[in-house]
Structures are given as structure tokens and as C-alpha cells.
Amino acid sequence: MDEEYDVIVLGTGLKECILSGLLSVDGLKVLHMDRNDYYGGESSSLNLTQLWKRFRGSDTPEENLGASREYNVDMIPKFIMANGLLVQTLIHTDVTKYLNFKAVDGSFVYKKGKIYKVPATDVEALKSPLMGLFEKRRARKFFIYVQDYDEKDPKSHEGLDLSKVTAREIISKYGLEDDTIDFIGHALALHNDDDYLDQPAIDFVKRIKLYAESLARFQGGSPYIYPLYGLGELPQAFARLSAVYGGTYMLNKPECKVEFDGSGKAIGVTSAGETAKCKKVVCDPSYLSEKVKKVGKVTRAVCIMSHPIPDTNDAHSVQIILPQKQLGRKSDMYLFCCSYAHNVAPKGKYIAFVSAEAETDNPEEELKPGIELLGPTDEIFYHSYDTYVPTNIQEEDNCFISATYDATTHFESTVVDVLDMYTKITGKTLDLSVDLSAASAAAEN
């Protein structure tokens, strides 16, 4: 422990593991520590016994649920956009060789008590029961504009400067109805609330393009992929990457106290009486609680079922977004389901999660609209956690703290945080312009 490191990373959550991998590849000397004796921190996957211990305090799940080891239940359930930032990061670092992915069957949106497949192209818009005949034509024109839009080709802009025009203005140009705007903004562009409407349209259009391009990657029913054996595989894969490039890992290290010099700069980490020196500290909010502030709360139901979610074409894996307006909420609700098809449960079992930003203190009542879509459940667990963002000035204390994972069921916001932290730590932007055709994600069924 007496050595000096460029960076000490505390916590083995996905964000911390991606960063330690990227920094190790950059040639920095990295020490990675965790107070837990397992990888993943808040973003780990639990077997059935661990799940019971965490939520029920006892170690004896019902026998009819099957073998404990066949369960890998994500604590932060998120799917991966097939053409998104996480896949680009996986390919950029060659971490794909440690993982096996499988396409996700379905992507749905909730409207007036029913769920519908999310249309993402002009062709799908014409077939979708989400819209009436005239609205389909308007939506088709909008989708064609988005598909043809190329930032570098002014001819495709139709006279609109998307860095100045708001999303609301571009939507009104096509005369789209409120319900259509709802599913485009929330189920395609994946915005969590309606703030995006008054922001420049460029991000909105890019997000829809990303969805459509991801959908086209696998010709499947959704734009998402997901690792076999659950998301707990991801932190471990990036940890292996870090180790290959000389990173040092230490699990089960008690306390992990960050040490500061007289000017308030981080200079090392002490655990069990030994101090390792460093120039910078990277960690999740739990390691430096005095340098973060609470900004909200995520509430989630974890459900074990013996059937797929009704009305999803018997999908073995599926995302359903319940837009805020449909529920009279301030932010969206998310439904995520996976099963034995991704090796996260025994044959015939499905794991479903209903997640939302908490707006009340009653998760059972608040998550009801999502839970009602599931049909009968074998077991249901509720949990909530506070969300934090850093408040420190990194240049002054050399501490780089990740934000807590949000309620969304996709990884885009997570990786934006990671790439932003990478830039602050290294002073450079990570170039992800890699050949995406090299992806090893297999679109099996």
C-alpha cells in the first residue's frame, strides 16, 4: 500500500470500473478498491439467496422459485442501446471479448391504459395502431426528415438550424398531436421529462436517429441489447481490462478514507491503517458523502414471475416506457423485463422491474400503474434509494465523484456521466469514433 498512484478509484460500480479501465489503458497507474467483497457496488447482480438476504433478511427463498445460482437480478436494471455510447466504449476498449450479448425482444410505450410497440421509422409509423390515419402521415413525414437529417449536409436541414430551433418548434412544423409527441419524446428520444421541448432540437433529433440506427443493427424488435448473465458482468469485464493494463484491485477493504492535504487536495486513501498515495481520487457518492448533495430518489419494484408481460407478444425481454403525462406524473415510469433467455433466471421464470423517480413516499401506490401491467407475480420486493450529484470543485480537491444511477432503463445517461468525468480527470475527450461493424454482439434469438 506504500506506493504512489496516479488515480485511486473507490467502489466497483459500473461507472467506476469503466473509468479505471479507460485510465489504465491511457497508461495511468490505477489502484481500485472497494469496501465490499464483491464487484459491482450498487450496480451488482444478485442471486436468489442474496436477494432474500437484502430484502427479507432471511436466507430461505421458496423452493418452487428454482436454484438460487440461476438468478442474476440486476440492482440497477438497464438495457444497452445497440449503437449507443456504452457499445462504442465496449468496442473502443475491446471489452466485448469478455462478454456475450443478446438482442432484447421488444420496446413498447404505454398510452391510455394499453401498451403498443414503439414505431421508429416511417414504415412502422404507417402500421402503428398508436395513431389515426392522418396523424400517421404527419408522423411519417417527420420520421423521414429525421432519417434524412445529416449534420454535415445543409440540404437535409430544410432551412432549419437545429442548434437554434427548439424541439417544440420542429414538432409544431409537422403538426404532431400531443400523444404522438409523448411517445416520440419519451419512448424514442428517451427524455425523462418534457424539459427537452424548449431546448435546441439537435439533441432531440440525434436521439431519435440513435434509436432508429440501433433498431436497424439487429433487425430485431428493439434497439437494445443485454449481456447474458446480467449487468453484473459489465463491471467485472472493465475490471479485467484495467488489470490487463496494470491496474491493481483490492476488494473487501474496510473504511477507505480519503486523505487531504492542508489546501484540501486529495493525496491518498487509508484503509486498515495503511495509506496509498495518489494524485486524484475517483469514487461513487458513498465514499465522499460530504461532497455530494441529494437531488432525488429512485423507487423500484423487483418482481419474479412465471410468465412474460401480457400484450408484449410473449417477449422474453422487453422495455416499456410509461410517459409522465399518461400517468399525471412529473417524470416517466419504466418497466424492464428479462428472463431465462438472457440466463438471469431459471427456465420459465421472468424478472420484471418497475422504476421511477419517487414523487411520493409510498412506492407500492406510486408504482401501481406499472405493476398492474405485469399480471400475477410470484414475489415482489420494493426498494428506494436517494440520488446524489457531486457539489465539489474538482480542480480544487482532485476528487471526481460519479452521480447516482437514475431511474431510466437504458445506459445513455450513465455513459454521458462517465465520459464527462473522463474529460475532467484527463483533460481530453475520449474518441469513440470506432468501426461499429466490429461489434461482437450477436443478435441471437
UniProtKB/Swiss-Prot annotation:
One GO cellular component term noted in the UniProt record for this chain: apoplast
Cross-referenced InterPro entries: FAD/NAD-bd_sf, GDP_dissociation_inhibitor, RabGDI
Annotated Pfam families: GDI (PF00996)
Superkingdom of origin: Eukaryota
This protein's name: Guanosine nucleotide diphosphate dissociation inhibitor At5g09550
PANTHER family xref list: GUANOSINE NUCLEOTIDE DIPHOSPHATE DISSOCIATION INHIBITOR, RAB GDP-DISSOCIATION INHIBITOR
Task performed by this protein: Regulates the GDP/GTP exchange reaction of most RAB proteins by inhibiting the dissociation of GDP from them, and the subsequent binding of GTP.
Similarity-based family: Belongs to the Rab GDI family.
Keyword terms of this UniProt record: GTPase activation
Organism phylogeny: Eukaryota, Viridiplantae, Streptophyta, Embryophyta, Tracheophyta
Entry's Gene Ontology molecular function annotations: GTPase activator activity; Rab GDP-dissociation inhibitor activity
GO BP of this protein: protein transport; small GTPase-mediated signal transduction
